[in-house]
Design a protein with these regions (language model features):
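Beta-strand-turn-beta hairpins that frame and shape the catalytic cleft
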Residues: 103-108, 145-170, 293
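Metal-dependent phosphoester-hydrolase catalytic domains
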Residues: 105-113, 183-211, 216-293
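A Trp-anchored, charged/polar loop motif used as the substrate-binding/catalytic surface
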Residues: 10-14, 134-156, 189-202
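Active-site-proximal beta-strand elements of phosphoester/diester hydrolases
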Residues: 1-3, 111-115, 163-173
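Extracytoplasmic/secreted cell-surface and envelope-processing proteins
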Residues: 36-42, 69-71, 175-178, 219-225
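Active-site metal-binding loops of divalent metal-dependent hydrolases
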Residues: 32-33, 171, 215-217
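Extracellular/periplasmic catalytic domains that process cell-envelope and extracellular macromolecules
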Residues: 21-22, 50-55, 91-95, 145-148, ...
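N-terminal, active-site-proximal structural segment of metallo-dependent hydrolase catalytic domains
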Residues: 1-100, 128-131, 140-142, 160-164, ...
């Protein structure tokens, strides 16, 4: 990714950058962005945007589960060392991870990272089981983390609204598995995490001024994903849904689906909301919401 950013001639990167420049959000969650320890690729990406667009002085990313090796067979194919044997799918550590670009600083001493939470430690976890027992094995479930990428709670200090808490994740697609429905169950529980978080299961949830956003990889009405978790989240009494029912991505063979969400807390006033669809950049749209108090 860094090589392609620095070369400056990758058509997809050019389209992504142009979309960001034209939209000019104050805070941006970037999904599917490769992580590196020094943040070199993210810095180069932000500098590329700043040439003709907003200056994102804050570039934030935590180590993801994507590509984090386990040395176990995590997908039940009898082999180890494959991309699905990592804590989250990845051909290398940091493959297709998450990042935040912001005009405003992150309150780093208040960041909460739940990426290391074991799947089995989620309340009422829906772990995969077959006739032979836990899938793919007891040993795998003993170390399997819930997050395929991460679950972050990140306060951002704004000049006029004070601290705004971002709650973000990128759930695994509920496909590419077998009859045990490992990915479908994990997708469901990655979404259910936020319901538990807002109920205070892990720490005191934010009282006000928060936004839950990310790629949940689950449409409430279409596709293979288990629907109870995403429907419950969209109906949560502390959240509002400014883009209710609007598809956010287009998939070959499936058509338009709603899998990306920006859900502000109910104490916000939603000034406007919308999507920017740029097929050359991504099959996912850029989702935006303009908020005030």
């Amino acid at each position: 990714l860094l090589r392609d950013i620095l070369k400056g001639d990758d058509p997809q990167i050019t389209a992504v950058v142009q979309t960001i420049i034209e939209s000019s959000p104050d805070v941006l969650i970037v999904q599917g962005f490769d992580y590196d320890l020094q943040g070199t690729a993210l810095a180069a990406f932000a500098e590329l945007i700043a040439r003709d667009g907003p200056d994102y002085a804050t570039r934030f990313a935590l180590p993801p589960n994507a590509g984090l090796k386990t040395n176990l067979d995590m997908d039940g194919d009898g082999k180890t060392g494959g991309p699905r044997d990592a804590q989250g799918f990845g051909r290398f550590f940091g493959d297709g991870a998450m990042a935040i670009l912001s005009r405003y600083p992150v309150v780093k001493n208040q960041v909460q990272d739940y990426s290391a939470l074991l799947w089995r430690d989620l309340p009422a976890a829906s772990l995969p089981v077959t006739k032979s027992g836990p899938f793919p094995s007891d040993a795998a479930q003993d170390i399997q983390r819930l997050s395929s990428h991460g679950h972050w709670v990140v306060p951002v200090e704004t000049p006029t609204l004070g601290a705004v808490t971002l709650m973000t994740s990128h759930a695994t697609p509920p496909v590419f598995d077998g009859p045990e429905d490992r990915n479908g169950l994990r997708n469901h529980d990655e979404i259910v995490f936020w319901d538990h978080f807002l109920a205070g299961a892990f720490a005191a949830p934010p009282v006000e001024k928060f936004v839950l956003l990310g790629d949940m990889n689950n449409d409430p009405d279409k596709g293979e994903g288990l629907k109870p978790a995403i429907r419950r989240l969209l109906d949560h009494p502390r959240l509002r849904d400014p883009l209710k029912g609007q598809p956010t991505a287009t998939f070959d063979g499936l058509g338009d689906m709603r899998v990306d969400y920006v859900l502000p807390s109910t104490d916000w006033r939603v000034v406007a909301s919308g999507m920017v669809r740029t097929p050359a950049a991504s099959r996912h749209s850029l989702i935006w919401v303009d908020l005030d108090r």
